[in-house]
């Protein structure tokens, strides 16, 4: 515990909260253009080829975003919507591409959890 004299000399610093998605600049989503679409392998206990895209955002940042769901149509110059949310087994991937908006189509033949993959209700 500091003394009163120490607190007068040096006031307590407020705790600054650090954002987990700085490239969004406080916005819920951001638009961006894919500069590269590729696959990467996850961290140790897991094994797969995860689909990711390098995206240049309207905020000026160049980020790596995960493409969720089975199959996608994203390629270079695709315009996509990016939201926050990391992928635990991919280091450095702190964003998700929103499916079913702009150039990213929804997942084909998706029946459950459709809203997360941009799929309309089947007739």
UniProtKB/Swiss-Prot annotation:
Record-linked SUPFAM superfamilies: Nucleic acid-binding proteins
Gene Ontology terms: cellular component: chloroplast; small ribosomal subunit
Keywords: Chloroplast, Plastid, Ribonucleoprotein, Ribosomal protein, RNA-binding, rRNA-binding
Primary location recorded for the protein, binned into one broad class: plastid
Biological process per Gene Ontology, one example term: translation
Chain segments annotated as transmembrane: none
GO MF annotations, alphabetized: rRNA binding; structural constituent of ribosome
Compartments in which it is found: Plastid, Chloroplast
InterPro entries on file: NA-bd_OB-fold (IPR012340), Ribosomal_uS12 (IPR006032), Ribosomal_uS12_bac (IPR005679)
Top-level taxon in the UniProt lineage: Eukaryota
Subunit structure: Part of the 30S ribosomal subunit.
Task of the protein: With S4 and S5 plays an important role in translational accuracy. Located at the interface of the 30S and 50S subunits.
Family: Belongs to the universal ribosomal protein uS12 family.
PANTHER family: 30S RIBOSOMAL PROTEIN S12 FAMILY MEMBER (PTHR11652)
Protein name in UniProt: Small ribosomal subunit protein uS12cz/uS12cy
Organism: Phalaenopsis aphrodite subsp. formosana
């Amino acid at each position: 515990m500091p003394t009163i004299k120490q607190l007068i000399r040096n006031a307590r610093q407020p705790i600054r909260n650090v954002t987990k998605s700085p490239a969004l600049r406080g916005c819920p989503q951001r638009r961006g253009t894919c500069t590269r679409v590729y696959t990467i392998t996850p961290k140790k206990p897991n094994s797969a080829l995860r689909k990711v895209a390098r995206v240049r955002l309207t905020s000026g940042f160049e980020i790596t975003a995960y493409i969720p769901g089975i199959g996608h149509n994203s390629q270079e110059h695709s315009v996509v919507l990016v939201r926050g949310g990391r992928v635990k087994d991919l280091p450095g991937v702190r964003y998700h591409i929103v499916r079913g908006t702009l150039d990213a189509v929804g997942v084909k033949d998706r029946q459950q959890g459709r809203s997360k993959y941009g799929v309309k209700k089947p007739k």
